[in-house]
């Protein structure tokens, strides 16, 4: 990949696209491209590592099991997710390309 905006899928792609940008012991950086996808009903991420995520382009709604309100993320917003903090993607803008930069790090 030549850049964060390179090789983007069409806005009508049925699956999210995950691209690993860098991997080192205790560190993984990936680009995630969503085009309207969200977490399956009832599914929660519960990851052993921390994750810092930046929304580069688009809109998304992120929900945490320990928060009553959903977080609406816009381009430029970021969140640091502690290990084992249950979370899910409730919504990404349908028909639009949403680009995430996710940094997974050992706790």
Question: Residue ranges of each PLM-predicted region?
Answer:
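Histidine-centered metal-chelating micro-motifs
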Residues: 61, 69, 78-79, 83-89
């Amino acid at each position: 990949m030549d850049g964060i905006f390179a090789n983007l899928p069409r806005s009508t792609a049925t699956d999210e696209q995950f691209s690993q940008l860098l991997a080192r012991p205790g560190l993984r950086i990936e680009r995630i491209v969503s085009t309207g996808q969200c977490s399956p009903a009832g599914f929660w991420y519960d990851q052993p590592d921390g994750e810092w995520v930046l929304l580069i382009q688009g809109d998304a709604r992120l929900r945490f099991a320990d928060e009553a309100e959903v977080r609406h993320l816009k381009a430029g917003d970021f969140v640091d997710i502690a290990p084992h903090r249950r979370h899910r993607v409730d919504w990404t803008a349908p028909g639009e390309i949403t680009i995430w930069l996710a940094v997974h790090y050992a706790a």
